[in-house]
Amino acid sequence: MKRTLLVTLALACAAPGFAHAQRIAPMKAGNFARLCTRATSAGICDAYIGGLTDGVSLSKINDRNEGDPSAPAGFCVPTTETMPVMRSKVLAWLKAHSETLDKPVGESVFAALHASYPCSVKK
């Protein structure tokens, strides 16, 4: 009985580690770049970039609609920036960093936005 309790407790303590796994889109950055260069799919590309941008911005907000304003931001896109400009910056970054084209799209687009829209560091 004591052994069963210890095993159950050990499994319960280990379980939260599995809860942090997140789904990663299977699309590669190279396929995304090809999609973004077609006029017929520019809207899909813009929606993905906008969704990633929103997700990063909203990731500081918890389930009580509270956030940590001191948490570092991954990138800072000005509110006046247009989606076509954002798309062109992401595509230019991907073109300049061809080693990332086999990586997951989210990782590469995040890196492109991070490089293209750095945040001011407050001292």
Residue spans of the language-model regions?
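Sec-dependent N-terminal signal peptides
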Residues: 4-13
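Solvent-exposed, flexible loop/coil residues
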Residues: 5, 79-81, 105
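Residue-level signal for well-ordered alpha-helical scaffold segments within enzymatic catalytic domains
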Residues: 8-9, 47, 112
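Short N-proximal segments of mature Sec-exported proteins
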Residues: 27-95
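Surface-exposed, polar helix/loop patches in the mature regions of secreted/periplasmic/lumenal proteins
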Residues: 84-123
